[in-house]
């Protein structure tokens, strides 16, 4: 007789006669959802991708369990979805459009850099790219302009002619890491609190200069939302973390993304609603970049951009042509659809 295992993260059918002490790989903890990140309280892995969260492998081995487990008490620490619901005041009435307009912060507030979360699949793709081709290889010197800067992170060399190729390039082949205020490069691990000191860190590898010119690219992009979150997605192959930045204020978004091949996507968006900058973040994956903006007030946005900004862009003939908002009401829209990403992340 085949029974269904109710251990979290398992869900397999098993034969009680062959149920061994190490037959089941599961999560003994509870789901944790905090600042758009999803994970289990029993292990450290976190992701913004809902289907990747569902596929996080169990961290504990034991026998299968055919009985439904009682609900465990919520752990202290990061807020879970249940605890957030408990804290929500009863009968909360959404603010009217007039109230939101009146309470909208001034647009001249300085933007802040959003933290970049680099997926394991992208790290593997960047490592493979580093093995396949050295920076600057195959670039036609006749196309390089005098005064061009080396594009490798950590190198400040300027092209003065063919003799510049003979000088060594000291650079960082890895990606920048920002965690709990500390800043470092994944390739050398020297940590610092000061952003200026981080930028001035000398490279840890010697190679060839990359004089490639970055080209503005027209990338496919769209957005979707839940009651508490707006996700802007820009599609492109192999975003380069060292050159990417996304800034946001409560009402504006500034995007600068560099993909493989020196293709650059840039956009400035005056947001329809107000966001919580401190809780927002950016996730880099092999085939796209997801910008997760946490709404300051729950509710649905009629569109991504503010009507005033759309009117101004319409007059000037310039606009950010976002694909239609796709999501309805679930974080399922954050799921990965590319089979190659799933294979790389395993």
UniProtKB/Swiss-Prot annotation:
Residues 98-109 have a biased composition (Basic and acidic residues). GO terms for molecular function: SH3 domain binding; zinc ion binding. Residues 216-305 form the CS domain. Zn(2+) 3 binds at residues 150, 155, 169, 209. A motif (SH3-binding) lies at residues 28-31, 70-78, 173-176. One of its GO terms (biological process) is centrosome duplication. Residues 321-346 have a biased composition (Acidic residues). Residues 79-94 have a biased composition (Polar residues). CDD domains: p23_melusin_like (cd06488). Zn(2+) 4 binds at residues 172, 187-188, 204. Zn(2+) 1 binds at residues 5, 10, 24, 64. One of its GO terms (cellular component) is Z disc. Residues 5-64, 150-209 form the CHORD domain. It comes from the Eukaryota. InterPro entries: CHORD_dom (IPR007051), CHRD1 (IPR039790), CS_dom (IPR007052), HSP20-like_chaperone (IPR008978). Zn(2+) 2 binds at residues 27, 42-43, 59. Keywords: Metal-binding, Repeat, SH3-binding, Zinc. PANTHER family: CYSTEINE AND HISTIDINE-RICH DOMAIN-CONTAINING PROTEIN 1 (PTHR46983), INTEGRIN SUBUNIT BETA 1 BINDING PROTEIN 2 (PTHR46983:SF2). The tail domain binds to the cytoplasmic domain of both integrin beta-1a and beta-1d isoforms. The presence of Ca(2+) ions does not prevent binding of a fragment consisting of the second cysteine rich repeat and the tail domain but prevents the binding of the full-length protein. This is Integrin beta-1-binding protein 2. It comes from Sus scrofa. The gene is ITGB1BP2.
